[in-house]
Design a protein with these regions (language model features):
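Secreted/periplasmic proteins
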Residues: 1-95
């Protein structure tokens, strides 16, 4: 069974260590999620324009109500303008 859903997504860019021990790379196609296992691939789609990106979970968060994903700056920019800050997305856990 494929896990899918909708939620808010934002982006972050600090150059800290991620929860799995990697140095955060704002240009990598990665994301933070509260519970998905590290290295899980997730397809994230912006329903407003149909653009999608596949990211790898390597961090924990976001810690803002209503949001389930924090995308790297590069991943967010692939599906929406950075000026928006956060958007509603559809997601599909690929494994």
């Amino acid at each position: 069974m494929v896990q899918t859903g909708s939620c808010g997504a934002s982006f972050y860019w600090q150059g800290q260590m991620t929860a799995n021990g990697e140095t955060f790379n704002p240009e990598g196609l990665t994301a933070a999620h509260k519970t998905l296992p590290f290295d899980t691939k997730v397809r994230v789609t912006n329903p407003d324009n149909g653009k999608s990106i596949t990211v790898r979970i390597n961090d924990r968060g976001p810690f803002i109500d209503g949001r389930c994903l924090d995308l790297s700056r590069a991943a967010f920019a692939e599906i929406a303008s950075l000026d928006l800050g956060h958007i509603e997305v559809r997601y599909e856990v690929l494994g």
